[in-house]
Amino acid sequence: GEPFLHPLLPQFITIAHQKGFIPILTTNGTLLDNAQSVIDAHPHKVQISLQAHEGNTKENPEEYIREVMHFAKEAARQGIIIVLRLWNEGGEHNSMNPELLKLMAQHVPTPWTERPDGWKLSELIYLETDTTFEWPDTERAPYEQNEAFCHALRNQIGVLVDGTVVPCCLDSQ
């Protein structure tokens, strides 16, 4: 689920810190306009999946990127790592990538420092690109039992939208 929907998210981040965890959030970035309380709770990293824009109802890319970049710059000022993700290379939903990059450059001027997985836009703000991510599905062929292995529980947990804690975000069923 979208973590920014949960009204207790800042408290969850605080509790995670108290228990010795390193809170990392992944969001589609559509609810960042009122996220100061999340910044104040100071997660270690926030990953924003920009490719989600084409699949969501937010029709105005300028407003979307303005909100994302405002959040990113404010969070980075407070020492939070921001990873903007475009994981849709080679997919059918990437026609807006050039426009999104152009809009980002209005907020964080180029040239950006190239990295193996994308670019460093500014201090603590990164843009990562990758191929389209497909969730593993045991119902989809071809699938072999030994093919799917999740390393998540070794260094992370998932929290589902209903608050259920799972070893891996794929454990929703």
Description of each model-found segment:
Residues K120-Q173:
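Accessory C-terminal segments flanking Radical SAM cores
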Residues E2-P116:
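Radical SAM/AdoMet-radical enzyme domain recognition
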